[in-house]
């Protein structure tokens, strides 16, 4: 059938880097483009046709317009025979022509010069629909009867008069922009430089902010009453999002909102190009998976944040995904356009949402919906990137659901029966058997509605699995081709989960981020593939560089909200990795209570979203601005700042003593509002408590580190309120920040004052409120508090890499989570309480029939902390509900049998003279001392401690380590005059799920008995034991084994493991599961797994990272909701040269519980003299490890595992 396209006037084109729009006045009734003829032709590249007409006499020629400064060429890839090109207008014949009284306006969404085949000759991609006279022709409503007056200068088209009011409803309320017009807000003025684009909301202009000389994009909403309500919703959502880190969560940053001539103006950062224009620029060629992956990861991160806030974007499509800077930051994207967004609680099932190509089935069928519709849209987007063509380019909702049903099958019967719009597209025939619903034929639908069905698909798939066969690259071979096929399998698997018709079964953003396609764990089977290395390198863009954010302009924005009301002082902080900067400027906290706003500029170089280590990737020359947002109020007052001059590796904010006195769980704060992103709201445990409340904001730091909550009590005889403050155990610059270091800050603080250290890694649990999770606190004897001043807690760790899990993703919890004390959230919480010896601490463990010593007792919350208990690796217990005496009846270790999640409490009384005779004598009498570590905090015992009970290690191993820098354990030579020591034990309870079989994990080992060591194995662990010499590889037989593989399942060929596990039957119970879902580190070592026999990180060779140019690492994104992801660190602590290693991987279920692991410093390694640079910053444990056993080479990386959501790392 011949088709004709008659153009009545030249097109009006609007274009810029932000977005572009173009209008063509056509007579749309008489043309039809059908791909079903035998002589199919495709649009060709042509710039010679006149701009006023274009006639296609026989087949599919379309006019191409010769417009300067615009790319007119669109070469349609023609090799696919599946695709069918159809018309956007009714092709029923002349009847449709007679019905049209006026010409319509076809508006393309980009600056292409013809009705490109991507839109199927006019198939609309926008959500606006005009369904009259059987034709679907309007892509986007515009005021269109009057063309814009344009001025073309060289290659730049600028707008002099953008819009002319007309009778069209879409033209009502548009603001008439004039070039170089000044838009004024309360605090800034903006000069209009260029028109960027228009939508149903209004228009976007490129403007110049005169005060800062930066380019911004201003969205000018229509003042029509029909847009007023949605404009208010958008402003409120942007106001909420402005309190989050826009760079971290990958959505456009909004600066301010103001009114200009009765039009609402929203000021945004200027972004370069949307994904649709990017596809068009590349002639709609398919995008390789290695480029789709970083885009998917970043958008899924944004959706995860929106889900945690209870927000629905509701218009996710390539046009609303912007490339930030395609040249300097390739494939760095942000999500824009929250004009259709809404809160999930206000979602109405009849609401018309989403652009049609990306519309979820629940919207089409009229079902209740939630934020899962955004995941459907994202699936359609990544499918479009993969195909170069929309997966479901429906010209109408009927075509849309028809395409979906043909490829993925009909929606379930219960969905169709519940849908309010089901009968528009389906017929229910009670005479038929199952299924009860039948999709209407195109003829039936056209007869009922007058809307003719179109075929606009380029690819018609019988199932989504068929997508893996298209667009296969021809330049790959060998392992590269195998890796590409494996990558496609994981991509299709993820795509099917994202395009699940049932929204309740659709994958969530968090699970998407932990899918193997994103974490790339499946690519570890191809270590020598250059294609795989390229994939890892492309994901580097997800590592973000953060520098000082312009908080001044942010404060002026009406979007910026403060936790505290107006105070006399604002203290704006961003953070570095050196605490001495805080020391040098700590006087600001004390002196600026009435001064102007003080700023501690401690900008950090690297904040890794995907947890790349800063040692591996250099900082960018063009860093992305960081965000300092909502704050916490610090009560001004006299301070006694610690005066140590040595730089700590951890960043802390040292708060004055009077700080706690003003802490209330209300918004009535005064003093220093510290602006931060995503801090942890800590809510009081009891009315007597005065905790620190931190609203949502972030203390952005270069690394995301685990938390520890430490509490200091003043020296009073009665119980006092507890002030829980997160302690972080890592630092940003690849250096170990152990509690020994951080606790030394407490040395200079007087004993009778309350001091708090605020770390900089509060982004670990954004949005999670620890309401009643503050458990009974640990008691440090006054002897240590007064004489030692915690001096032994700190070692001189001035070097080394940081071993910590990365937790930087947002929380999934929309509101605060109230946790009862009996059901603690495993957040790695340990309370350290200093009291006088005369004080008594009533504790809940009295209910467990265990007396509490008033002298010194210790309670440790169930936190995922590596417990090093001196020379006795078997003294701690968390996985067993057993009551085993340690010293005598007065010295029990109590594991209370509370409901899951249990609170594992270990109480070890200090040694007193009257208890000397009742203690068990150690088997090794030569061992006189031990050091207990609370997250590597060394606390010395009395000389005749029983810690050597069941210790298979000689005494000289302790002294051998004392000389090493960074050693935690004390030797036996410590005099007995050290006084009473405190034994501090952290017990992490958890269980790990192996496939569908859940087994209890012995996180800290079995309880030791009087005579023999007891080995505990986690999963199939080879059991690296905790000894005074660090972690020691299992030597065999009955060696004491205590794997610290808290959430991993180690695999090894050690046969003694199973022997010990079978020889030590003990009652075991399932502990509270903490799902470590988020991390997935990867390290490549260029070479065969057989090339080396020792662990690459334990080799005494030169530094591993600097000497490995082919080392590519990538860590999966995490979220605070999946904080639990401890490193599988056992194999790092085996002796150097040992041929055994614990290559571990984990199979994690989808259960989500918060958990915070604790980092490991290099001092715990077998040899502290090994250069810390030999170890990767955060996740160096999962490289291909050479082994003397060929059968265990690939145990660390199972071939295409199905449920592995992370690889642990350090």
Curated annotation (Swiss-Prot):
Residues annotated to bind ATP: 196-204, 219
Q: Which SUPFAM superfamilies match?
A: Protein kinase-like (PK-like)
Any one GO BP annotation for this protein = negative regulation of transcription by RNA polymerase II
**What keywords are annotated for this sequence in UniProt?**
ATP-binding, Cytoplasm, Isopeptide bond, Kinase, Nucleotide-binding, Nucleus, Phosphoprotein, Serine/threonine-protein kinase, Transcription, Transcription regulation, Transferase, Ubl conjugation
Which region ranges are annotated with the description Required for localization to nuclear speckles? 891-998
Reaction(s) the record says it catalyses: L-seryl-[protein] + ATP = O-phospho-L-seryl-[protein] + ADP + H(+); L-threonyl-[protein] + ATP = O-phospho-L-threonyl-[protein] + ADP + H(+)
Where would I find the Glycyl lysine isopeptide (Lys-Gly) (interchain with G-Cter in SUMO2) crosslink on this chain?
25, 120, 124, 991
**Family annotation (InterPro entries):** Kinase-like_dom_sf, Prot_kinase_dom, Protein_kinase_ATP_BS, Ser/Thr_kinase_AS, Ser_Thr_dual-spec_kinase
List, from the UniProt record, the residues annotated as the active site of this protein.
Answer: 315
Q: Which Gene3D superfamilies match?
A: Phosphorylase Kinase, domain 1, Transferase(Phosphotransferase) domain 1
Residue ranges of the region described as SUMO interaction motifs (SIM): 902-926
Query: SMART domains, from UniProt?
Result: S_TKc
* Motif range (Nuclear localization signal 1 (NLS1)): 844-847
Q: Which Pfam family, just one, is annotated for this protein?
A: Pkinase
Q: Give a GO cellular-component term.
A: cytosol
Annotated Low complexity bias: 941-959, 1047-1063, 1095-1104
According to its UniProt record, how is this protein modified after translation? Phosphorylated and activated by JNK1. Autophosphorylated.
Tell me the superkingdom of the source. Answer: Eukaryota
Quote the EC number: 2.7.11.1
Its annotated function is as follows:
Serine/threonine-protein kinase involved in transcription regulation and TNF-mediated cellular apoptosis. Plays a role as a corepressor for homeodomain transcription factors. Phosphorylates DAXX and MYB. Phosphorylates DAXX in response to stress, and mediates its translocation from the nucleus to the cytoplasm. Inactivates MYB transcription factor activity by phosphorylation. Prevents MAP3K5-JNK activation in the absence of TNF. TNF triggers its translocation to the cytoplasm in response to stress stimuli, thus activating nuclear MAP3K5-JNK by derepression and promoting apoptosis.
Which PANTHER family has this protein been placed in? DUAL SPECIFICITY PROTEIN KINASE, HOMEODOMAIN-INTERACTING PROTEIN KINASE 1
**Family indicated by similarity:** Belongs to the protein kinase superfamily. CMGC Ser/Thr protein kinase family. HIPK subfamily.
Describe, as the record does, how this protein assembles with itself and its partners.
Interacts with Nkx1-2, Nkx2-5, MYB, PARK7, DAXX and p53/TP53. Part of a cytoplasmic complex made of HIPK1, DAB2IP and MAP3K5 in response to TNF. This complex formation promotes MAP3K5-JNK activation and subsequent apoptosis.
Q: What is this protein called?
A: Homeodomain-interacting protein kinase 1
Originating species = Mus musculus (Mouse)
Query: What lineage does the source organism belong to?
Result: Eukaryota, Metazoa, Chordata, Craniata, Vertebrata
